[in-house]
């Protein structure tokens, strides 16, 4: 299992636009083969208010490549991308493919 980790640098004054984008992406991502672990918005309690995150699971790297192609072609995703770009809510994004470290079974 692999996880796509997305870090967004956002305009904190446009958090509502980013939240609307995140909510609108659930269906296109799921329909394209991704399993959303979550979209995470910043809070004023701790950490930067200009950073938001998303995590999306895929089984294999081959599945990830299929997911990316399907998502890029998804009409709702394309419209979501156009809207968020026009809003200026996202300044930049960073993506990484990460893998969860699990504890070893007892006795190994």
Give the residues covered by each predicted segment:
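Glycine-centered flexibility motif
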Residues: 13, 34, 45-47, 88-89
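Long, low-complexity, Ser/Thr/Gly/Pro-rich intrinsically disordered segments that act as flexible linkers
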Residues: 91-108
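An amphipathic, aromatic/His-enriched active-site/gating alpha helix that lines ligand/cofactor pockets
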Residues: 20-38, 57-95
């Amino acid at each position: 299992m692999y996880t796509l980790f997305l870090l967004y640098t956002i305009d904190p004054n446009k958090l509502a636009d980013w939240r609307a984008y995140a909510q609108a992406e659930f269906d296109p991502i799921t329909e394209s083969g991704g399993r959303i672990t979550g979209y995470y918005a910043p809070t004023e309690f701790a950490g930067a208010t200009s950073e938001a995150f998303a995590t999306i699971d895929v089984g294999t790297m081959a599945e990830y490549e299929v997911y990316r192609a399907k998502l890029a072609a998804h009409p709702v995703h394309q419209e979501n991308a156009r809207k968020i770009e026009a809003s200026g809510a996202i300044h930049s994004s960073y993506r990484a493919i990460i893998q969860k470290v699990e504890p070893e079974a007892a006795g190994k």
